[in-house]
Amino acid sequence: MADDAGAAGGPGGPGGPGMGGRGGFRGGFGSGVRGRGRGRGRGRGRGRGARGGKAEDKEWLPVTKLGRLVKDMKIKSLEEIYLFSLPIKESEIIDFFLGASLKDEVLKIMPVQKQTRAGQRTRFKAFVAIGDYNGHVGLGVKCSKEVATAIRGAIILAKLSIVPVRRGYWGNKIGKPHTVPCKVTGRCGSVLVRLIPAPRGTGIVSAPVPKKLLMMAGIDDCYTSARGCTATLGNFAKATFDAISKTYSYLTPDLWKETVFTKSPYQEFTDHLVKTHTRVSVQRTQAPAVATT
């Protein structure tokens, strides 16, 4: 209500007692048009959102080579992209393969401030986790002047950062994979998160933030260990995501490439060498004997 009054030129408007507070909140430039500028910016934001909604209904026109290959059905699955470590620059590629099964959840929205000459400029930072609960998970972080814009940007970045999750067994290989294949560790800042395999039926033993990411990754049972300043939710989530993404960064013996011993050319073409061999006679000349006394 105070902001609306300020925009209308009330007590909290430009030149009024609330000018510094509102200027600190939005960080406008100039003293006379701060309230009106904010109002116009907010209106334009709504217009962009409406036009963006209509644009989403339009047909996807890829702008990258990978996008063209995906749309033309030359690439059949995300795993083909991950196999060759191709960078994904368009979020529509993820929607093309996983659109129906993807679920997103906002982990946190926190205000961040920057000190300027006009006061404090406040923006909103959104942390969004996205996954299909079946081996794919992503984490996006976006900062914007408006909450809705930050969430939309974080969802797009989360789609672009989706990684495959490797799952395994705690003991015997019975049924479907249900836990992490072995102990993995992720780190961000001072936060260190360790994921430990757990027996079937244990569930996810962890704090709420890693639990959401592990559930979205499709991991049913897991022990976790965390140290550092885990109250910093951003670093906590990033460390967990780093640990999950490391499940495919190592090779276990069952993934070792089978060694095939091939014969050397001398062994392979022995018969040919025998047939084409010609005996060369070498005449040895004997040096004359030297008489010794």
Curated annotation (Swiss-Prot):
What does the entry list under GO cellular component?
A: cytosolic small ribosomal subunit; nucleolus
**Any one Gene Ontology BP term:** translation
Q: Which GO terms describe its molecular function?
A: RNA binding; structural constituent of ribosome
Q: Kindly give the Gene3D superfamilies that the UniProt entry links to this protein.
A: 3.30.160.20, 3.30.230.10
Phosphothreonine found at: 252, 270
The main location is cytoplasm
Q: How is it modified after translation?
A: Citrullinated by PADI4 in the Arg/Gly-rich region. Asymmetric arginine dimethylation by PRMT3 occurs at multiple sites in the Arg/Gly-rich region.
Position(s) of the covalent cross-link Glycyl lysine isopeptide (Lys-Gly) (interchain with G-Cter in SUMO2)?
275
Is the keyword Transmembrane in the record?
A: no
The family annotation for this protein states: Belongs to the universal ribosomal protein uS5 family.
Q: What is this protein called?
A: Small ribosomal subunit protein uS5
Q: What is the lineage of its organism?
A: Eukaryota, Metazoa, Chordata, Craniata, Vertebrata
The UniProt gene name for this protein comes to RPS2
